[in-house]
């Protein structure tokens, strides 16, 4: 996995948006990332989020990471892909407790 720049800012985003778990998966983790690739992220929240909240958080993450992100929640993952994603993902942030 490539190093994620600005981890301090990323942790701040997680804390300010009720993210208790954030993982990266897909081409970024597998090493076949290109200039056109987005960053696939899986998030778990401590409080329910509206679609507008998710879009706003995705936009903020894209700005910090310097490229388009695709933010998914566990509930939004296809059951057919869930196991593969969980096997390849790398945890970026997990709130203790």
Predicted regions mapped to residue ranges:
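Catalytic core of pol beta-like nucleotidyltransferases
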Residues: 1-23, 29-35, 46-97
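Conserved G/P- and acidic residue-centered "switch" motifs that form tight phosphate/ATP-binding loops
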Residues: 26, 40
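Short hydrophobic/aromatic beta-strand micro-patches
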Residues: 42-44
């Amino acid at each position: 996995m490539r190093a994620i720049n600005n981890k301090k800012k990323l942790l701040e985003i997680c804390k300010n948006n009720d993210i208790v778990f954030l993982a990266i998966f897909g081409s970024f983790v597998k090493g076949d990332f290109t200039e056109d690739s987005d960053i696939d992220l899986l998030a778990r929240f401590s409080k329910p989020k509206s679609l507008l909240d998710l879009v706003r958080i995705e936009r903020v993450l894209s700005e910090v990471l310097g490229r388009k992100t695709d933010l998914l929640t566990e509930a939004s993952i296809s059951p057919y892909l869930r196991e593969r994603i969980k096997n390849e993902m790398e945890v970026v942030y997990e709130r203790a407790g």
